[in-house]
Structures are given as C-alpha cells and as structure tokens.
Amino acid sequence: MKLTVKTLKGSHFEIRVLPTDTIMAVKKNIEDSQSKDNYPCGQQLLIHNGKVLKDETTLVENKVTEEGFLVVMLSKSKTASSAGPSSTQPTSTTTSTISSTTLAAPSTTQSIAVPASNSTPVQEQPTAQSDTYGQAASTLVSGSSIEQMVQQIMEMGGGSWDKETVTRALRAAYNNPERAVDYLYSGIPETVTIPATNLSGVGSGRELTAPPPSGGPNSSPLDLFPQEAVSDAAGGDLGTLEFLRGNDQFQQLRSMVNSNPQILQPMLQELGKQNPQLLRLIQENQAEFLQLLNEPYEGSDGDVDIFDQPDQEMPHSVNVTPEEQESIERLEAMGFDRAIVIEAFLSCDRNEELAANYLLEHSADFED
C-alpha cells in the first residue's frame, strides 16, 4: 500500500509498504527513498496520532492505514547509522574564513561563531551553551506562519495537544518546530526559560523572521531587527543605538544574553548576514551597545554585567584552509551543532579524527 509521510516543514512524500512491515523497516524504507543524508534510519522518529511508534511494532499493530499518514522527524541522538567522520561533503574551491562575529563590517567570506577564549578546553563548555545556541540559530517562524505551524503540530498530535500547550512549547523552543515537538513528547526542561513574547507578533510591528529553510534546523539565520528601523536611525541621529531600547527583538536578545553571554556571538554573526547596516552601527558604537545590553530590564536582578571588560571578551577570528573547512563540514554532518564542532576541532589541534572521536565519546553531554 501507499503511505503518506509528512515532515515538520510542511512537505510530504509517499512510500510503498506492507501492513506487516515493522516500524524499523519503514524507517529503512524512508532512508532509502529520501537518502541517508536527509533521513538517517537511526535518527528517525515516526509519529502516528500523537504517539511515537516503537521499532519492533508493525504498521497494522499501530492501526496505520493507507488513508492515514505518519510524521517523520529527526532526533538528536547520535547513532552509528547517522555518524561517521568519513562522510563526504561538497568541496569548496574558495578560501573560507571562520569568524566569531567581530564587530566589524561583514565580508563575503563564510563566517561562524567561535567563543572568545581558546584557553577553555572543550570539555569545560556547559551543555546549556549548545542548547542556547540551538535556540537562537535555529529556523524561526513568525506571524501567520506560527499559526500554521501550531495547527500542523496539533494535527500531528492527533488531538493529544491543545493549542495552548503547543503554543507554549513553541515559545520555549524559540519557535523551532522540531524542538517544540521534542518538548511536547519529553516535557519542557526546567532549565528552559519560556520567553514572554507575543508569538503572533500582532501589534508589535516587528517580528522575528527568517528566509525559507534550505536545510537542517540550523540553516536559516536570524533577522533580529528590521532594516527600516536602522535606516530611520541612520537618517536621523547617526551613531546612536537609542532606537534599540524600544525594540522588542532587542529586549529578547538581552534576556537571552543575560542567561548565557556566549549566545551574543552567534546572534551577532547572524545579524551581520541579515542586517550589515546595523552591525556596522554597532561596530561604531560598541560601548553604547554593551551599555544597552547591561542595563537592568524587567525580570532581571538589576545588576547585569555581560562583559566585565569588553575589549577582553570581544570575539576574534580564526583562519582555516579549504581542507580544514571540509573537515569541519564533515564533523557537522555527523549531527553536532556547528559551534560545538568548531570548539572540538580547534581544541584537538585541527585533527579531524581526534575531533570526531571526542564528539562521539561525549555525544551524551551535547544532547538537550
């Protein structure tokens, strides 16, 4: 029979199965038809009527029929079927620069976030750092797209979740649908702070937006601030960041940075891609920008000091060869967050095999 399989991105595809096929066999079927790179068997979660299906059960046992559908999503667990440092990635003939969002005008070279200090070993990095980075750099949806996503997740749950529950999970996941579904099944961790923001963006006039996703959950950059707001500021009192004080997205950024200062680097890096004019303005007014970040805000203790010494904590740049860039991409393809891959690669003296071994041995530490 033909079976429809839906994804969290709203797309769907069909596979041919037998009612007696096990869920593991269906996962293998999906891996074969959609490619191992996109849907590795070991990372798949198949959902039917709000229930995660067990590998050893069959379609008929789970009452899956041709008239129904399955939902497929990828878990963050690292398995042998989805990990391998020898996996190939498209090569690049251009020289790449790995940058940690320096407060300078962005260039056309590729840039990513690297923590400011290389003296800290990889194993000392807290798990919350990668979790917060994932929240900030993941695909975001907003406005009417959120309403559509809420409906899709409710449909996926087969009536198991109401709108309020789904909305709360999305807020906790910073509008990342895959993470939100994880929260719905496993519960929202106590360490996760649910931002008090209006998901629909109604009345704010300024929404978190992102271009259509082109890959994994970390493929779409953030658009923290609208271009027109920066243009208005530049056209008026050039050299001031006062307009950020009333910006909803900036307030959310302050809250996140207060919880974990490391998140500022990747968020500024993404900002440089989406809004280079604002990044240039921040570059010209670094002291004022840090002062705005350090100002007490509602919900804080009133004594926030994100950077004790701004000059000492500002990000830096690290150059890599095309071969090293390919190594980083292969490590990232194993399923690890890009920031963690960079940390491991540099700490292992740019040795891909050592970095891969470290990432696999400590994979449990990187999971949410």
Curated annotation (Swiss-Prot):
InterPro entries named among the record's database cross-references: Rad23, STI1_HS-bd, UBA, UBA-like_sf, Ubiquitin-like_dom, Ubiquitin-like_domsf, XPC-bd, XPC-bd_sf
Polar residues bias: start-end ranges: 116-136
Organism: Arabidopsis thaliana
Deletion phenotype: Increased UV sensitivity in roots, specifically in dark conditions.
GO cellular component, one term: nucleus
Family: Belongs to the RAD23 family.
Claim: DNA repair is one of the keywords in the record: yes
One Pfam family linked to the record: ubiquitin
Ranges where the UBA domain occurs: 142-185, 320-360
GO molecular function ontology, one term from the record: damaged DNA binding
Lineage: Eukaryota, Viridiplantae, Streptophyta, Embryophyta, Tracheophyta
Entry keywords, A to Z: Cytoplasm, DNA damage, DNA repair, Nucleus, Repeat
Function recorded in the entry: May be involved in nucleotide excision repair. Binds and presumably selects ubiquitin-conjugates for destruction. Prefers multiubiquitin chains rather than single ubiquitins, with a binding affinity for 'Lys-48'-linked ubiquitin chains. Acts as a ubiquitin receptor that associates with the 26S proteasomal docking subunit RPN10 for the indirect recognition of ubiquitinated substrates of ubiquitin/26S proteasome-mediated proteolysis (UPP). Involved in UV tolerance in roots, specifically in dark conditions.
Subunit comment: Interacts with 'Lys-48'-linked polyubiquitin chains. Interacts with RPN10.
Gene name as annotated: RAD23A
Stated name of the protein: Probable ubiquitin receptor RAD23a
Any one Gene Ontology BP term: nucleotide-excision repair
Annotated Low complexity bias: 80-111
